């Protein structure tokens, strides 16, 4: 008998625990059931400290036998199948299906610039983090949530098991944008220092920091698999501006006077495309995944189309 998701009310519809800032037209029972069929994909095997929900074939002891392979120098002699040796006079090591756990670390940029945009970038990031966190918890992966603000990463949540999704969403709902400047590089470095072992790190950020390329380098240097969800708002991607304007930095309060005309906007879009391409190139060189997004993207499209196409989930 199919059980309802841990988060779903018996009557179906919108789960009652979901915070108000999680769109009730998206986070319904059907959406959650679809998320439960997904996994965050790994490019290479990751060895966790506990048994979890991911199945991998490896040497060792487990409940389910998988296959044999030829013995190699250094293999554990206890895993040799002596019955096969007696028949074939060849040494084989037994392989088993073992379920591993993986830590999924969600790094949420809560700098002041993330509060801008329509729809707000931070709100989109929180919703995306909620969906990714739900996938991980339903897969019995461990989930860690850290907020990047100021010069530090504030670790909010370390969870495991689908029943802990309530705590994850409550923590996400309580996150507010920072007041004042955020040093994204320092915050990312602080977050990297808190990582234990290898896993998957997902950064949700607008990357509006003069040294944002160093953020990717810092995270990639941890040895974890890194996913960059680069979130910009529609008015940043295609600004509808004209005339004489004063643009004010959301974090520092510094302003600059500009005249917006067709030439200015064309130059802006050219530089924007080159800026995003530089992140994509850097991510590829560091074996990270880079996904550029607009904050007006439908969440179902993000989870079931875009991130699957980019092989982030599957």
Where do the model's predicted regions map?
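Short amphipathic alpha-helical interaction patches enriched in hydrophobic/aromatic residues
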Residues: 114, 172-176, 287-290
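Von Willebrand factor type A / integrin I
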Residues: 1-57, 193-199, 209-211, 215-314
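Short, electropositive alpha-helical surface patch
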Residues: 156-171, 308-309
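Short, flexible loop segments at the rims of nucleotide/cofactor-binding pockets, characterized by
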Residues: 83, 177-181, 204-205
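Short, contiguous clusters of charged residues that form electrostatic/catalytic patches at enzyme active sites
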Residues: 127, 131, 182-189, 277, ...
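Von Willebrand factor
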Residues: 164-199, 211, 232-233
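Conserved phosphate-coordination/catalytic loops
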Residues: 123, 178-185, 270-273
